[in-house]
C-alpha cells in the first residue's frame, strides 16, 4: 500500500481537500481519500503540500499509432474502413506514451486519423505498459468518421476517387449507415445475412453501444455530422469542433459532447482560421459537455493541462477546465467507473504536481502513479 499525505487533493468528485491523503491499495485501486487517513503498513509519500489530482484523460489522440516512415493511423486504400481496430496498431513503446506519463496523462483514447470518411474504432488505454492487451481500459470506445478537408484531400485530390466533395463525404457515410441498418435488422429478425466485415463492425454504432467520433472543424461540417447522426438516431461526439463557438446555441439544442482542440498551434488550413481558445468557454456556457484534446501528435500530449489552462484564461471556469481533462472525457468514453476522479474503488491513477499545471508555466508531474504503480518520478 502507498499513502500519499500532506497534499492539496483535487478529487474531481467533491470538495478539494486542503490537507488531504490518498491511499493506494495493493490491488492498484484507490483504497481511501480523506484528510486524516492512517495506514501503518503503507509506504508513505509526503507530497509536501503539492497539488494531487486524478491522472489526466485525453479524449482524442493518435498516440501509439505512428511509425518513423509511415503512420499507422490512416489506411489510405479505401475511404470506408470501419472494420479496422486501433488496438491492432498501438505500439506501447511509442515515446509519446512516455511523454504522456511525464505529463500526468494516464489514459488516452487513441485511434485512426481523419483521412477516411469512416476510419475504424478507437480504444481507451493506459499510458504505461509493454503489452497493449493489458493496457486496455475499453475497446472499442467509438467509431471514427471525418468531414471536410481531410477526406477530400486524401482521396479526391490525391487519390482521384471519391470523395472529391463534401457532398460525397455525406453520401458515403449515409450509404454505409443505410446498409448497416439493413444488416442489423436482418440479424435482429433472425435472418442470416452474408457476413460483411464492414457492416459487422458498424453494429455497435447502430445499437448505440458506442458513438460516432466525428472529426469536424467548420460549422457547416459540424452541423452535417449532427444532421446525419439524427437521421439514424446515433450517439456521437463532436471532435475538434473548431467553429463550435459560432453555432453554440444550435449545438446546445442537440446535446452532443464537444471535444475541442487541437487549439495550441498554427492555422494550417482554412478550416482552422476561426480557431480560438474561446471555444470551450462559449460551448460550456451554452450548456455542452466539453473536453479539451491535443490530437497528439498534432500537439505534444504532455501539453494537455496547458491547453486546459489556456482555455481557462479565455473564459472556461477553472473547475470546468479541470473537468475537461479528467471526469468529462472519462464520462464521454464510458470509463468513468474506473478513471477521471479520485474515489475509493477506482483505478489508482494519481498525479502529484510540482505546481498547478493549469495556472503555472512549468507546472509538471512530480510523480505519476498508474494502476497503483509508480510510472514516473521527476529526477529519476
Features from the language model and the residues they span:
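Histidine-rich, glycine-flanked metal-binding segment
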Residues: 9-53
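Polyanionic/metal-chelating signatures
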Residues: 103-223, 227-236
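Metal-associated gating/positioning segment near the N- to mid-region
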Residues: 50-112, 116-117
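C-terminal cap of metal-dependent C-N hydrolases
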Residues: 4-11, 18, 331, 343-380
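Divalent metal-coordination and catalytic microenvironments
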Residues: 7, 22, 28, 49, ...
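His/Asp/Glu-enriched, well-ordered alpha-helical/loop segment
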Residues: 68, 75-77, 81-82, 211, ...
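Conserved beta-strand scaffold positions in the cores of enzyme catalytic domains, especially
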Residues: 3, 42-46, 142, 368
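Active-site core of metal-dependent hydrolases
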Residues: 86, 184-276, 291, 331-333, ...
Amino acid at each position: 500500500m502507498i499513502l500519499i499525505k500532506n497534499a492539496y487533493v483535487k478529487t474531481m468528485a467533491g470538495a478539494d481537500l486542503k490537507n488531504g491523503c490518498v491511499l493506494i491499495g495493493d490491488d492498484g485501486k484507490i483504497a481511501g481519500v480523506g484528510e486524516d487517513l492512517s495506514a501503518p503498513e503503507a509506504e508513505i509519500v509526503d507530497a509536501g503540500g503539492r497539488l494531487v489530482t486524478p491522472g489526466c484523460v485525453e479524449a482524442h489522440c493518435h498516440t501509439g499509432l505512428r511509425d518513423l516512415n509511415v503512420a499507422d493511423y490512416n489506411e489510405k486504400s479505401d475511404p470506408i474502413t470501419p472494420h479496422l481496430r486501433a488496438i491492432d496498431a498501438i505500439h506501447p513503446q511509442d515515446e509519446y506514451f512516455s511523454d504522456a506519463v511525464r505529463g500526468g496523462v494516464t489514459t488516452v483514447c487513441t485511434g485512426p486519423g481523419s483521412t477516411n470518411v469512416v476510419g475504424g474504432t478507437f480504444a481507451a488505454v493506459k499510458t504505461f505498459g509493454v503489452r497493449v492487451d493489458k493496457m486496455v481500459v475499453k475497446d472499442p470506445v467509438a467509431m471514427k468518421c471525418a468531414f471536410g478537408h481531410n477526406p477530400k484531400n486524401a482521396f479526391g485530390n490525391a487519390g482521384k476517387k471519391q470523395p472529391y466533395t463534401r457532398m460525397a463525404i455525406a453520401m458515403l457515410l449515409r450509404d454505409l449507415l443505410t446498409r448497416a441498418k439493413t444488416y442489423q435488422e436482418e440479424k435482429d429478425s433472425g435472418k442470416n445475412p452474408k457476413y460483411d466485415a464492414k457492416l459487422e463492425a458498424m453494429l455497435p454504432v447502430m445499437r448505440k453501444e458506442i458513438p460516432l467520433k466525428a472529426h469536424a472543424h467548420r460549422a457547416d461540417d459540424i452541423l452535417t455530422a449532427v444532421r446525419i447522426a439524427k437521421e439514424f438516431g446515433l450517439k456521437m461526439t463532436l471532435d475538434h469542433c473548431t467553429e463550435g463557438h459560432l453555432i453554440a446555441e444550435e449545438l446546445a439544442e442537440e446535446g452532443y459532447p464537444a471535444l475541442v482542440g487541437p487549439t495550441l498551434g498554427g492555422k494550417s488550413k482554412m478550416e482552422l482560421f476561426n480557431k480560438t481558445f474561446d471555444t470551450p468557454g462559449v460551448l460550456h456556457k451554452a450548456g455542452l459537455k466539453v473536453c479539451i484534446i491535443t490530437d497528439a501528435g498534432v500537439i505534444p500530449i504532455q501539453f494537455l493541462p496547458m491547453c486546459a489552462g489556456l482555455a481557462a484564461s479565455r473564459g472556461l471556469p477553472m473547475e470546468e477546465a479541470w473537468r475537461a481533462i479528467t471526469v468529462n472525457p472519462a464520462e464521454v468514453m464510458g470509463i468513468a467507473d474506473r478513471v477521471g476522479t479520485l474515489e475509493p474503488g477506482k483505478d489508482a491513477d494519481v498525479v502529484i504536481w510540482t505546481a498547478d499545471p493549469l495556472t503555472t508555466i512549468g507546472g509538471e508531474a512530480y510523480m505519476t502513479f498508474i494502476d497503483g504503480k509508480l510510472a514516473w518520478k521527476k529526477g529519476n
